[in-house]
């Protein structure tokens, strides 16, 4: 019995070392949109992320103040809390929604099934589209397609709502991302975004230990840059397409428990080891340092979880919106 325990401990330590080596030697640095697509294709195809995180590849909402909650349930709760915060719950059935960075469609299906919305989900990953389509019953009014959030294929003023969860860190051009999100909204339409952000380094520059931590958080999951909450709100306002003010809030405390819960899933669900084998175990352990760094960064104030809400102004988009040129002719004229 003792020998078996020692063998199991040695095997776990060996796989942990291998996972750490892979983490250090083979980061997933952002190179282009293709590198993001390839990363999500790989994560989708091996099934490990879906097994542990469910249909929602985003953090959970644990309440205010946060309380203990089932990890998968917290993700469902996040969607409903975001609907309420964005003031979408009273919109009529048939409201058209664009889910930007839809993953494998978890949020899209809730929005369609439980709120009666007509949802289009887009992702840069072909394999995520395939899996989202497999998971979506025919009676659920949600469809999915490959698209680029920096150059959306939809005409101006196409949707009543644009919704996005944790897609922004993958965008190298935050100003263009902001413009595209608002461009495809109808006048009076609502934009609701949830994202990982960093502290506004214009106010408090990153210190000597924060810079390497931030570099690891960017390089391990194909992130070119994190915006600050203040900075992305300014990018949205600078498009000239927002009616009134951009509303923001900070959900760091509400989402913080999700990082350690992500690791805990591997402990409380050991059947994953049987299902995915030694290779799956090594892949899972490879992600643990990033989860721990994320918990450290969000807990210490280096990173923040930002929420954004904006209403689309009744103006036309021009090619020079980013430079401040707006056609004030009403869209419907």
Walk through the language-model features, giving the residues of each:
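N-terminal auxiliary segments of SAM/dcSAM-dependent transferases
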Residues: 2-50
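Conserved alpha-helix/loop element of class I SAM-dependent methyltransferases that forms part
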Residues: 72-93
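A short acidic, Gly/Pro-enriched loop at the edge of an enzyme's catalytic core
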Residues: 150-162
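Acidic carboxylate diad motif detector
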Residues: 193-195
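Substrate-binding/catalytic lobe of Class I Rossmann-like enzymes that use SAM or dcSAM, i.e.
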Residues: 205-207, 212-302
């Amino acid at each position: 019995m003792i020998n078996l325990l020692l063998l199991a401990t040695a095997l776990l330590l060996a796989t942990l070392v291998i996972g750490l080596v892979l983490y250090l030697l083979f980061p997933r640095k952002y190179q282009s949109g293709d590198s993001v697509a390839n990363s999500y294709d790989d994560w989708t195809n091996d099934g490990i992320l879906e097994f542990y995180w469910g249909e929602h590849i985003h953090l959970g909402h644990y309440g205010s103040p946060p309380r203990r909650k089932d990890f998968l349930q917290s993700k469902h709760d996040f969607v409903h809390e975001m609907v309420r915060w964005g003031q979408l719950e009273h919109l009529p059935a048939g409201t058209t929604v664009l889910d930007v960075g839809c993953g494998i469609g978890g949020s899209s299906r809730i929005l369609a099934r439980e709120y009666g919305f007509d949802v289009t989900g887009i992702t840069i990953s072909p394999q995520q589209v395939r899996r989202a389509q497999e998971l979506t019953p025919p009676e659920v009014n949600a469809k999915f397609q490959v698209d680029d959030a920096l150059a959306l294929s939809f005409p101006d003023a196409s949707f009543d709502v644009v919704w996005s969860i944790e897609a922004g860190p993958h965008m190298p051009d935050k100003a263009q991302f902001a413009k595209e999100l608002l461009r495809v909204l109808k006048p009076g339409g609502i934009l609701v975004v949830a994202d990982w952000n960093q502290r506004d380094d214009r106010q408090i520059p990153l210190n000597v230990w924060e810079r390497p931590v931030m570099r690891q958080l960017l390089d391990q999951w194909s992130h070119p840059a994190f915006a600050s909450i203040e900075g992305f709100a300014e990018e949205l306002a600078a498009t000239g397409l927002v009616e009134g003010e951009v509303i923001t809030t900070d959900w760091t405390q509400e989402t913080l428990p999700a990082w350690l819960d992500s690791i805990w899933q591997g402990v409380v669900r050991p059947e994953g080891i049987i299902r995915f084998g030694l290779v799956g175990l090594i892949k899972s352990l490879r992600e643990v340092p990033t989860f721990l760094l994320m918990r450290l960064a969000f807990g210490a104030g280096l990173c923040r979880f930002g929420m954004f809400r904006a209403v689309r102004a009744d103006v036309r988009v021009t090619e020079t919106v980013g430079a401040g040129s707006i056609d004030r002719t009403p869209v419907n004229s």
